[in-house]
Amino acid sequence: MPRYAQLVMGPAGSGKSTYCSTMVQHCEALNRSVQVVNLDPAAEHFNYPVMADIRELIEVDDVMEDESLRFGPNGGLVFCMEYFANNFDWLENCLGHVEDDYILFDCPGQIELYTHLPVMKQLVQQLEQWEFRVCGVFLVDSQFMVESFKFISGILAALSAMVSLEIPQVNIMTKMDLLSKKAKKEIEKFLDPDMYSLIDDSTGDLRSQKFKKLTKAVCGLVDDYSMVRFLPYDQSDEESMNIVLQHIDFAIQYGEDLEFKEPREHEEESSSMFDEYFQERQNE
C-alpha cells in the first residue's frame, strides 16, 4: 500500500513549523496518524514531536565551526543538505517500512535548494522509490502578499519549486489569523486572482518598459495556464484547515487504498462540510 508525504516548503518565516504543528493536531482530531520529520539542519526549536531530526545526522553550527570547511550560514546549510542527500539510508532507517504512513517533511526555507541544487529533487525521487505519494506544500506569509508586486514575487517563488520538483503542489497563504478584517478583504482578490487586473495595478508605477513587459508576461503565463492558486490557512479556524487538507489529500489520492477503521469510542464524527473560507465572513 502507498505511503504519503507532504514537503512543507516556503521562505524563512512563512510559518512552516507552525503549519506542521497545527496540522498534526488537526489530523489527530480526525483520528489520522501524522508524523513530522525535521529537514532543517539550522532549526533551533519546534513545538511538536518528530520521528526524525536531520540535526541528529548533521547540524549547521557544527559545520560552521569546522576550521577545515570555513562555511558561512548559507554555505553550511548547502553542505548539510548535500551530506543528507548522500546519506538517505539514515532517513530510510528512521522512517521504517510501516504502511499507510503520512509524514510531513519540514524543509529549510532557502530558495536555492529548489532552484540551483538537486537535493530536494533527489529527495522526492527517493521517497517515490519508497512508495510515497508526495505533494509539495508551498507556504507564503499572507502579510507579505497584500501588494501586487509582492504577490507576483510569491508566485515566482512557488513556480520555481513546482517546476524544479515536478510533483503536485498546493500553495498556501499562512497567518490569516493575524490579518485585520480590512486586510482579509484586500487579500481575498489574491486567492483566485484576475491576473490582468493585477497587471494594471503592478505596472502603473513602473518607469522601465522592460519591467512592464516582463510583469505582463509573467501574469499572462500564470493566467493562461492556471498554474498558481493560493488557499488561505487560518490556524484558528478548523474549516480553513479542513479545506487545505482536502486539497492536499486529493492531490496525493489519500484514502483510496486505505482500509476502513472504526472510530475510537466517545469520538464524534468529523464534519465533512468544506465550504469556502470567506463565504461565512462576507457579513463581518
From Swiss-Prot:
<dbReference type="GO" id="GO:0005525">
    <property type="term" value="F:GTP binding"/>
</dbReference>
<dbReference type="Pfam" id="PF03029">
    <property type="entry name" value="ATP_bind_1"/>
</dbReference>
<comment type="subunit">
    <text>Heterodimer with GPN1. Binds to RNA polymerase II (RNAPII). Interacts directly with subunits RPB4 and RPB7 and the CTD of RPB1.</text>
</comment>
<comment type="similarity">
    <text>Belongs to the GPN-loop GTPase family.</text>
</comment>
<feature type="region of interest" description="Disordered">
    <location>
        <begin position="262"/>
        <end position="284"/>
    </location>
</feature>
<dbReference type="InterPro" id="IPR030228">
    <property type="entry name" value="Gpn3"/>
</dbReference>
<feature type="short sequence motif" description="Gly-Pro-Asn (GPN)-loop; involved in dimer interface">
    <location>
        <begin position="72"/>
        <end position="74"/>
    </location>
</feature>
<keyword id="KW-0378">Hydrolase</keyword>
<comment type="function">
    <text>Small GTPase required for proper localization of RNA polymerase II (RNAPII). May act at an RNAP assembly step prior to nuclear import.</text>
</comment>
<feature type="binding site">
    <location>
        <begin position="174"/>
        <end position="177"/>
    </location>
    <ligand>
        <name>GTP</name>
    </ligand>
</feature>
<feature type="site" description="Stabilizes the phosphate intermediate; shared with dimeric partner">
    <location>
        <position position="74"/>
    </location>
</feature>
<protein>
    <recommendedName>
        <fullName>GPN-loop GTPase 3</fullName>
    </recommendedName>
</protein>
<dbReference type="InterPro" id="IPR027417">
    <property type="entry name" value="P-loop_NTPase"/>
</dbReference>
<keyword id="KW-0342">GTP-binding</keyword>
<dbReference type="GO" id="GO:0016787">
    <property type="term" value="F:hydrolase activity"/>
</dbReference>
<dbReference type="GO" id="GO:0032991">
    <property type="term" value="C:protein-containing complex"/>
</dbReference>
<keyword id="KW-0547">Nucleotide-binding</keyword>
<dbReference type="InterPro" id="IPR004130">
    <property type="entry name" value="Gpn"/>
</dbReference>
<feature type="binding site">
    <location>
        <begin position="13"/>
        <end position="18"/>
    </location>
    <ligand>
        <name>GTP</name>
    </ligand>
</feature>
